[in-house]
Structures are given as structure tokens and as C-alpha cells.
Amino acid sequence: MSILQMLYYPDQRLRKIARSVSIISHDTKKIISDMFETMYFQQGIGLAATQVDIHQKIIVIDLNNNIQKRLVFINPCIIKKIGTITHIIEGCLSIPKIRASVPRSQNIIVQSLDENGNNFEMEATDLLSVCIQHEIDHLLGKLFIDYLSPFKIQRIHKKINKWSTVYKNHIKLSH
């Protein structure tokens, strides 16, 4: 297993639409394993292949850092949104230090393949529902900030520019 290189906003590769996985091979399983390792290293609860510059429809989720409850979704598709819209504060490994309230369906039914190629459907609620929707958005080239107002996006850009300037200056000083 290895830790994969993350893509960070505003990298345009995050906007690339992922392609479906046609064959689940040994390479696919290695990607999944590496994605979990990367997600744990980054202290996340979900990761889409797009975030590590692999443009295949694969997401991994582990809400509780529990190897027995790890979830893999290959070619996931939300087939039904149920109930009310919820607003949960979201963050993203590809947009560090930024959090925002995003409208999401509280309950969904998702259809997918597992890591062995078996088709399954599951109902997801609350945080799991939000996480699946967030990660599927990545596969579609969308980011959670796309749901925000232009004013909020402008504020986020200012923060990112400030942090990248501080980071670049820190790198120069430490060399």
C-alpha cells in the first residue's frame, strides 16, 4: 500500500469527470487499498479517486476509522433521494481548512459495485448520505464550494491565496 498524491483546489484536474470502471482488476483493488491508506493518512472520512488524480468512478468511505466498516463504491449512482434537505458543515481533503454548510438530501439510495464486482443497493442516512453525495460530486467534477454563493466563494479564494502566500514564504525561509 502507498499514500497517493492529493490534488488541491484550484487544480483543474479536480474538475475532470471520472470514467466508469469496466473491469475490476488487481490494479483496481490496489487503487482502492492505496485510497484507503491515503484517506487515513489525511485524516478524512471519504475519498474519491479524482482527488488523487485517478479519474475512475471509485470512492472509499470510513466514517469511524474502523477497518470492518470500510465502504467501497465503484460506479456509484444515486437512484433516489428521500426526505428532507439537510445542511451539514462540510470540509474536503482537496480544499484544506475550508468548511461550509451545503444542502444535501438527508437520505439516499445508492446503487454501486463493491470491490469484488458485486452489484448492491444501500440506503444511506445522515452523515453517510452526505459523505456519499460529496464524494460522488467529485466523480462528476464538482466541489462542495460550487454550492456556495459567489460572495462566499470569493472569501474562500482570498483565504486560499493568503495561505498559499504564507506557505510559499515559509518554504523560502526554511531553505
UniProtKB/Swiss-Prot annotation:
Residue numbers annotated as active site: E135
Molecular function terms, GO-annotated: metal ion binding; peptide deformylase activity
Domain of life, source organism: Bacteria
Reactions this protein catalyses: N-terminal N-formyl-L-methionyl-[peptide] + H2O = N-terminal L-methionyl-[peptide] + formate
Function: Removes the formyl group from the N-terminal Met of newly synthesized proteins. Requires at least a dipeptide for an efficient rate of reaction. N-terminal L-methionine is a prerequisite for activity but the enzyme has broad specificity at other positions.
Family, per entry: Belongs to the polypeptide deformylase family.
Protein name as it appears in the record: Peptide deformylase
Highest classification ranks of the organism: Bacteria, Pseudomonadati, Pseudomonadota, Gammaproteobacteria, Enterobacterales
